[in-house]
């Protein structure tokens, strides 16, 4: 069996401060939150590199705004997705729980919907095609996914099912059994492998929506597969047939829709063209 590396989920404890004689406890900074920050920084760096390619519609000067829109989509969509897809009962009992993000609870599928909405707004603002923008963003998403799963691993959350295989790991929060380190499986597949494939695939001009649809297909397949060794949410369990999880139910439409779009993209190919930066002459601000 593998041994958990005993990483403290709290990266930095800020302690407390005294203001006008009153002690205020400052929040701890967790590795999970830092992984989001590292992910956005790396997305900006890789996006800046990719923006220099002539077949991408995004200009380097857009990256700060673009990453901000993506970040808002991830955080707001991820939180709303978790509440409505995975724990709607808790929301009905306490609607304000939706806003207590620090208590945990984020959903990739909700984050994806949030990013899609954010990119619709940004595409309209910058006067570019929405699908061209999604093709640019898609290869950046696995960076955040992989780092987020590492954050889950450090926090000992979203672990795998019990196993007797040598790859099983004993987590200190549940020392009685060995489990699949499914967070690391997801970090490898949804993070490293997905990034490598999409980065390579998008390095040349591809038909409009081909890159984004390939992301949907591959992520859906990877997530569906890993769900077989990932522990279902305790308050949900299995949804259908006694074995299908909520994550698999949400991933199946991604695979189907992605495959249909990918087929259509190559059947009726159209290619993005890089237009002049509308902000270069000051016509766009912000």
Curated annotation (Swiss-Prot):
> Which Pfam families did the record assign?
LGT (PF01790)
Q: Which residues form a coiled coil?
A: none
Q: What is its EC number?
A: 2.5.1.145
Which compartment or compartments is the protein found in? Cell inner membrane
Q: What's the main place this protein lives?
A: membrane
Q: Where are the transmembrane segments?
A: 29-49, 66-86, 101-121, 130-150, 181-201, 209-229, 250-270
Q: Which UniProt keywords apply?
A: Cell inner membrane, Cell membrane, Membrane, Transferase, Transmembrane, Transmembrane helix
Q: Does the keyword RNA-binding apply?
A: no
What does the entry give for GO biological process? lipoprotein biosynthetic process
* Topology with respect to the bilayer: Multi-pass membrane protein
A Gene Ontology CC term for this entry?
plasma membrane
Summarize where a 1,2-diacyl-sn-glycero-3-phospho-(1'-sn-glycerol) binds, as residue positions: 149
GO MF terms, alphabetically ordered: phosphatidylglycerol-prolipoprotein diacylglyceryl transferase activity
The lineage's top-level taxon is Bacteria
Biological or metabolic pathway of the protein: Protein modification; lipoprotein biosynthesis (diacylglyceryl transfer)
Q: Which PANTHER family did the record assign?
A: PHOSPHATIDYLGLYCEROL--PROLIPOPROTEIN DIACYLGLYCERYL TRANSFERASE, PROLIPOPROTEIN DIACYLGLYCERYL TRANSFERASE
Role noted for this protein: Catalyzes the transfer of the diacylglyceryl group from phosphatidylglycerol to the sulfhydryl group of the N-terminal cysteine of a prolipoprotein, the first step in the formation of mature lipoproteins.
UniProt lists the family membership as follows:
Belongs to the Lgt family.
Return the HAMAP family for the record: Lgt (MF_01147)
Q: In its UniProt entry, what is this protein called?
A: Phosphatidylglycerol--prolipoprotein diacylglyceryl transferase
Source organism = Teredinibacter turnerae (strain ATCC 39867 / T7901)
Q: Which gene encodes it?
A: lgt
């Amino acid at each position: 069996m593998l041994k958990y590396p005993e990483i403290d989920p709290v990266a930095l404890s800020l302690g407390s401060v005294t203001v006008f004689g009153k002690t205020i406890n400052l929040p701890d900074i967790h590795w999970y939150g830092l992984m989001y920050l590292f992910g956005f920084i790396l997305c900006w760096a890789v996006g800046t590199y990719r923006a220099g390619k002539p077949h991408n519609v995004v200009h380097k000067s857009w990256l700060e705004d673009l990453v901000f829109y993506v970040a808002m989509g991830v955080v707001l969509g991820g939180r709303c997705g978790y509440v409505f897809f995975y724990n709607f009962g808790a929301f009905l009992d306490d609607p304000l729980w939706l806003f207590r993000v620090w208590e945990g609870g984020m959903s990739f599928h909700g984050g994806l919907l949030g990013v899609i909405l954010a990119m619709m707004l940004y595409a309209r603002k910058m006067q570019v095609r929405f699908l061209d923008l999604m093709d640019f963003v898609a290869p950046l998403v696995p960076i955040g996914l992989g780092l987020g799963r590492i954050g889950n691993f450090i926090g000992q959350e979203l672990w795998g099912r019990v196993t007797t295989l040598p790859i099983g790991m004993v987590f200190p929060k549940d020392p009685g059994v060995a489990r699949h380190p499914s967070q690391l499986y997801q970090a490898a597949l949804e993070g490293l492998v997905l990034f490598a494939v999409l980065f390579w695939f998008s390095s040349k001009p591809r038909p409009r929506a081909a890159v984004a649809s390939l992301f949907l297909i591959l992520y859906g397949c990877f997530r569906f597969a890993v769900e077989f060794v990932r522990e279902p949410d305790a308050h949900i369990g299995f949804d259908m047939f006694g074995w299908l999880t909520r994550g698999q139910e949400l991933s199946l439409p991604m695979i189907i829709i992605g495959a249909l779009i990918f087929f259509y993209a190559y059947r009726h190919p159209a290619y993005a063209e890089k237009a002049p930066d509308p902000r270069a002459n000051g016509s766009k601000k912000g």
